[in-house]
């Protein structure tokens, strides 16, 4: 499929794509502005004047925005103007939370990435005229990269990852993807394997700079509050972190096995933290239907009472708090076939980690964390919960895993510096 056929297909499928996004937006809440002028590369009536020659960073959603934090912060500290684009409302909200001060002083602007129509991408680049574009992780769009080439905007894929399954799935885009990847001026890969697969798919060359996720600084205030909160509960805590579709039901069923521990003193408290806010109410309904006593973190009622089985983590931006509060973290996305969620943040907090069998989005990180003694891999949700209970009974083993987790994340830090070094001639 060449780029022309890709564009025709995109135009034909656009109504279905917009319907899917509308449904997602309706569940998630927030201001998605699916048909705002900016989504088509146009300046709206209230759009601010663009920054002069900004460094443009695209972070599609929540996870990518968090991962981009150390890079964006480093650019801001150098005094550079930054244009930060997103596709989802959760990503944009996280950007506002992380970089509110820079937005307030006019050094950073946020915008929607336009849909990948040729005219929209041309208008976007002509309006903002970035000195360079940095696409986070996997955001390769054929028409966007073609427009950047035509307008002389150098483009890099940073903290790039590309799994074996991504390589297989890329085949249907054919020539359009090969041309897009070949049009990247630089590919800064997380690992040699990621870079090699990107070259198989069409990129010309790559440099390994590592994952920016290892450089994300966890807020000390949240860590302190999390530790204090856990101490005040007087109970051991297991976090079910970043659970995805279908996993809440698995774990809620497994939590039933904790009934045998009701007589234990103190009884374990479960933190259930769905990955996406649109599923908070759904998880609450499942807990209610299962007959589990639960409270919602958003209710702000302080430490849950001893009768509470589960605290539903229905807040955004508090993952460091949850990890600091937990004695053990079971990281979701890896028990359903979804590739896993970020385990690096939990390890950075010094929390022992258990992952499931499906970690292809974090293949190297999961493998290395397990080898370092920072994490365990369980075959299913029930086993993961059983292992977490065993760890609660073995403080020396938990402490060893905690120390290994911190050492492992510290050993892999430095991707921000390496990324900046690789882009130095673009940044001026």
From Swiss-Prot:
Entry annotation: catalytic residues: 64 (proton acceptor)
Keyword DNA damage tagged: no
Keyword flag Transcription: no
GO molecular function annotation: Kdo transferase activity
Enzyme class per UniProt: transferase
GO cellular component labels: plasma membrane
Annotated site location: Transition state stabilizer: 137, 213
EC number: 2.4.99.12
Its membrane topology: Peripheral membrane protein
Pathway: Bacterial outer membrane biogenesis; LPS core biosynthesis
Pfam family, one: Glycos_transf_N
Subcellular location(s) of the protein: Cell inner membrane
Entry keyword set: Cell inner membrane, Cell membrane, Lipopolysaccharide biosynthesis, Membrane, Transferase
List of residues binding CMP: 274-275, 316-318, 342-345
Catalysis performed (reactions): lipid IVA (E. coli) + CMP-3-deoxy-beta-D-manno-octulosonate = alpha-Kdo-(2->6)-lipid IVA (E. coli) + CMP + H(+)
Gene Ontology biological-process entries: lipid A biosynthetic process; lipopolysaccharide core region biosynthetic process
Free-text function comment from the UniProt entry: Involved in lipopolysaccharide (LPS) biosynthesis. Catalyzes the transfer of a single 3-deoxy-D-manno-octulosonate (Kdo) residue from CMP-Kdo to lipid IV(A), the tetraacyldisaccharide-1,4'-bisphosphate precursor of lipid A.
Family, per entry: Belongs to the glycosyltransferase group 1 family. Glycosyltransferase 30 subfamily.
Protein name in UniProt: 3-deoxy-D-manno-octulosonic acid transferase
Organism: Bordetella pertussis
């Amino acid at each position: 499929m060449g780029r022309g056929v890709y564009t025709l297909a995109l135009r034909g499928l656009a109504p279905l794509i917009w319907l899917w996004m509308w449904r997602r937006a309706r569940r998630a809440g927030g201001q998605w502005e699916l048909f705002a002028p900016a989504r088509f590369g146009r300046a709206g009536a209230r759009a601010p004047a663009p920054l002069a020659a900004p460094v443009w960073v695209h972070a599609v959603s929540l996870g990518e925005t968090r991962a981009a934090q150390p890079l964006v912060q480093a650019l801001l500290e150098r005094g550079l103007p930054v244009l930060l684009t997103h596709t989802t409302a959760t990503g944009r909200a996280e950007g506002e939370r992380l970089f509110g001060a820079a937005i307030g002083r006019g050094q950073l602007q946020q915008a929607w990435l336009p849909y990948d129509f040729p005219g929209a991408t041309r208008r976007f680049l002509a309006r903002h005229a970035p000195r360079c574009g940095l696409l986070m992780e996997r955001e390769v769009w054929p028409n966007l990269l073609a427009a950047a080439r035509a307008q002389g905007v150098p483009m890099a894929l940073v903290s790039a990852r590309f799994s074996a399954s991504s390589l297989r799935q890329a085949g249907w885009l054919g020539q359009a993807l090969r041309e897009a990847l070949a049009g990247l001026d630089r590919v800064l890969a997380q690992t040699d394997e990621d870079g090699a697969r990107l070259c198989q798919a069409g990129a010309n060359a790559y440099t390994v700079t590592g994952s920016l996720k290892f450089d994300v600084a966890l807020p000390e205030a949240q860590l302190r509050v999390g530790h204090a909160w856990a101490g005040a509960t007087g109970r051991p805590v297991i976090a079910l972190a970043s659970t995805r579709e279908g996993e809440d039901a698995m774990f809620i069923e497994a939590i039933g096995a904790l009934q045998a521990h009701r007589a234990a003193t103190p009884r374990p408290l479960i933190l259930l933290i769905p990955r996406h806010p649109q599923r908070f109410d759904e998880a609450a309904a499942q807990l209610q239907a299962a007959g589990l006593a639960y409270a919602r973190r958003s209710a702000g009622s302080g430490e849950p009472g001893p009768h509470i089985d589960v605290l539903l983590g229905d807040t955004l931006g508090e993952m460091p708090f949850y990890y600091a509060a937990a004695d053990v973290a079971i990281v979701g996305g890896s028990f359903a076939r979804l590739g896993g969620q970020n385990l690096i943040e939990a390890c950075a907090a010094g929390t022992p980690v258990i992952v499931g069998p499906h970690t292809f989005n974090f293949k190297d990180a999961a493998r290395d964390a397990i080898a370092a003694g920072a994490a365990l891999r369980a075959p299913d949700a029930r086993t993961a919960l059983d292992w977490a209970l065993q760890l609660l009974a073995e403080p020396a083993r938990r402490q060893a895993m905690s120390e290994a987790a911190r050492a492992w994340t510290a050993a892999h830090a430095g991707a921000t510096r390496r990324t900046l070094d690789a882009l130095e001639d673009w940044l001026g």
